[in-house]
Amino acid sequence: MRILDTTLFYTQASGGVRTYIDGKRQALLRRGDTSHKVVMPGSRVFFDGDFVSLPAMPLPLAPGFRFPLRLGLWSSIIAGLQPDVIEAGDPYTPAWAAQRAARLLDVPSVGFYHSDLFTLVHHRVGRFLDPGTRAYIKRLYEGFDMVLSPSRVMAEQLHRCGIGEVEVQPLGVDLEAFQPQRAKPNARRALGLSEDQHLLVFAGRGTQEKNIPVLLEAMRRLGPDYH
C-alpha cells in the first residue's frame, strides 16, 4: 500500500504534526509492505526520496512556515505519486489538493483536524467571522472520506461546524522516551522540590493558540504543592 501525507505543518519549525507523521512513518515502514511519502511546502519543487517539497509562500508572522497557493500544482504532483490513500494534516491548500488528487485517482482521502482553525480565527481576527469559518470547515471536511481528530474537544468543535462523523485518534505517548525508568531524582532536587510536590511539565511551542496564560493560571490555583 502507498500512503501519502501532505500538510503545511511539516517543516523544521513545526512540532506536534511533524512528530506524528514521523512516528507514523516509522511504524508503516516497519511493516515492509507499505510505502510512505510526505508532500510539504518549500521554496521550489524538489524530490528527495520519499519527501517532496512544493513551492509555498513564506509567512512573515510565522517564521519557518510557508503557505501554498498553487492548488493545481500541488494536486497534480500528489496525484502523480499514485498513492492508495491520501491524508491531509491541515485545513488549507494541501487539504483541497489532497481531495482533488483523491478524486482524480479514485482513492480515499483522510482529513486530520490537527489545527483548530475555528478557535484560531475566532481569537486572532474576531467572532464576526465565526459563521464563515464554520461554513468553510464544513465544506472542506465534508469532502473527505474520513475525518480524524486528536481529541474529543477538537471532535466536538467539528460537530459544531456540522461535521457528523469524526473518529477520535489520540496521538499517544512515546513510551521509549517517557517511562519511569528514565526518572532523574537529581532533577527534582535541583528544582528544590520535595517528594510530595507534583512536577508538571509543558513541552511545546510558545504560541498564542497554546493558551499558556490559562496553564499558568491553573498552576497558580493549584497552589504550592504543584510546580
PLM region spans:
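A short helix/loop element that forms part of the nucleotide-sugar donor recognition site in Leloir-type
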Residues: 179-193
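An amphipathic, basic-hydrophobic alpha-helix
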Residues: 60-88, 93-100, 104, 131, ...
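Nucleotide-sugar donor phosphate/pyrophosphate-binding loop at the beta->alpha transition
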Residues: 108-110, 119-139, 149
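Conserved donor-binding/catalytic core segment of Leloir-type glycosyltransferases
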Residues: 4, 194-220
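N-terminal subdomain of nucleotide-sugar transferases
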Residues: 1-45, 49-55, 220
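Active-site proximal beta-strand in glycosyltransferases
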Residues: 3, 85, 102-120, 148, ...
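Donor nucleotide-sugar binding/catalytic pocket of nucleotide-sugar-dependent glycosyltransferases
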Residues: 134-183
